[in-house]
């Protein structure tokens, strides 16, 4: 049974999403919500993120909204190092702080500022070691930063009994098409 899941994927700019009100976000959040609800019904208790912009932050927002329906659901934010948001613009820092305020657990893997890329790799390993499953939104057709984590994830899953769900754009598009179709049907 999956009690703790790590959800990660593209950063917003890797999806060419630069505004909080971009229509794509609505659909991605609906997809994430649908995925999480299925896991919650099977016993999911905790969702962990590292606090990256994009899929992870949208996941946090979804978890926070799901707490109304599932009050036992918990959100953990495990940053790779202290002050990892210091180079973000003010709007993104405010969004992050709102999530931190509503998270059930926050911590940094490294209790120091950025020292090198090894901190990201060690944090990725920490997430694998402390969760039962990863949901990774990543598609080989659009290579970006999650490709490094994907390699680590696949190797880890092959060596252990770890569960991974690598979500492609095809799966997301099928969900979006179904969602749009059901929205159109409800207006008739």
UniProtKB/Swiss-Prot annotation:
<protein>
    <recommendedName>
        <fullName>UPF0398 protein Sca_1081</fullName>
    </recommendedName>
</protein>
<dbReference type="Pfam" id="PF06908">
    <property type="entry name" value="YpsA"/>
</dbReference>
<dbReference type="InterPro" id="IPR010697">
    <property type="entry name" value="YspA"/>
</dbReference>
<comment type="similarity">
    <text>Belongs to the UPF0398 family.</text>
</comment>
């Amino acid at each position: 049974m999956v009690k703790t899941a790590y959800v990660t994927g593209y950063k917003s700019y890797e999806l060419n999403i630069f505004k909080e009100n971009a229509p794509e976000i609505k659909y991605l959040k609906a997809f994430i919500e649908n995925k999480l609800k299925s896991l919650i019904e099977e016993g999911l208790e905790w969702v962990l993120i590292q606090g990256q912009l994009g899929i992870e932050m949208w996941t946090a927002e979804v978890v926070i909204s799901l707490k109304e329906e599932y009050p036992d659901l918990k959100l953990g934010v495990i940053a790779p190092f202290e002050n990892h948001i210091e180079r973000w613009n003010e709007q993104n820092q405010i969004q992050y702080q709102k999530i931190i305020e509503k998270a059930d657990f926050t911590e940094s893997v490294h209790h120091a500022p950025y020292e090198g890329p090894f901190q990201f790799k060690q944090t990725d390993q920490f997430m694998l070691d402390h969760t039962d499953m990863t949901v990774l939104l990543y598609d080989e057709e659009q290579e970006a930063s999650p490709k490094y984590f994907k390699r680590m994830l696949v190797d880890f899953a092959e060596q252990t009994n770890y569960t991974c769900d690598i979500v492609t754009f095809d799966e997301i598009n099928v969900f979006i098409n179904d969602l749009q179709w059901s929205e159109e049907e409800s207006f008739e």
